[in-house]
């Protein structure tokens, strides 16, 4: 059984600064990290490996220069995957979800897999599209919002998905793609032994040409800015007489 778990490198939000002059966001000092939602996907894949015993977990990502960071690679591999595959190109920095999905699908097809697991969304965009688009590109079943994996055999996967007023139990044939929610598990913190062992695990670096993509479409970011702060109107009504109560009610009506 070969399981691919996809992840995205995103800027660490605590390092993002706001320029006071125009409200634009400054990412220059922001380190990259694994998207929080993808940590659940990695954990889910590694838990399945422990249950099955003979499974292989491959971490996979497409992106730009952030994927060249040795510390970032070690962070991923220390969380349990046996191998890492990264597809690197500068244009993937600003790739739209459908282009990211196309690249992931091509890389997964080249690598071979039985099950592909990704997070429900990414910490930066949270478009919640990539998992389903990968399934569409590969023409295989895909389910999003998975909150629990009930069983996995050589041919079938059974999962639970929580909706607003009900819980679905779904069975799909393999190969398949699932996007997991944060409810599925609590990602573990890697041990020192796992961190040291991560440096010995294999890493494959591919280009778009290696997976059969001649060009990578991307969008051009014009500006990323924080929303303008609005001044809050503070109305203080002193006293508890009828006039004050009437004024209080009138102000509430204006808000509603």
Curated annotation (Swiss-Prot):
GO terms for molecular function: electron transfer activity. Disulfide bonds: none annotated. Keywords: Electron transport, Transport. The keyword rRNA processing does not apply. Gene3D superfamilies: HUPs (3.40.50.620). Pathway: Amine and polyamine metabolism; carnitine metabolism. Heterodimer of FixA and FixB. This is Protein FixA. The gene is fixA.
């Amino acid at each position: 059984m070969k399981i691919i778990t996809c992840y995205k490198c995103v800027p660490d939000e605590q390092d993002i600064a706001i320029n006071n002059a125009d409200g634009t966001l400054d990412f220059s000092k922001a380190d990259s990290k694994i998207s929080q939602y993808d940590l659940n996907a990695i954990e889910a894949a590694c838990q399945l490996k422990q249950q099955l015993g003979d499974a292989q977990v491959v971490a996979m990502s497409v992106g730009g220069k952030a994927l060249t960071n040795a510390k970032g690679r070690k962070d991923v591999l220390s969380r349990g995957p046996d191998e890492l595959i990264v597809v690197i190109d500068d244009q993937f920095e600003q790739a739209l979800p459908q282009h990211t999905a196309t690249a992931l699908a091509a890389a997964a097809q080249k690598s071979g897999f039985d099950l592909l697991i990704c997070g429900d969304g990414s910490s930066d965009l949270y478009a919640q599209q990539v998992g389903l688009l990968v399934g569409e590109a590969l023409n295989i079943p895909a389910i999003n919002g998975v909150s629990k994996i009930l069983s996995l055999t050589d041919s079938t996967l059974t999962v639970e998905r929580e909706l607003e007023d009900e819980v679905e139990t779904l069975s799909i044939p393999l190969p398949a793609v699932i996007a997991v929610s944060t409810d599925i598990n609590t990602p573990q913190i890697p041990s020192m032994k796992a961190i040291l062992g991560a440096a010995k695990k294999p890493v494959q670096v591919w280009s778009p040409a290696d997976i059969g993509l001649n060009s990578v479409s991307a969008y051009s970011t014009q500006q990323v800015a924080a929303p303008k702060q609005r001044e809050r109107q503070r109305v203080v009504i002193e006293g508890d007489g009828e006039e004050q109560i009437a004024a209080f009610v009138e102000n509430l009506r204006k808000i509603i």
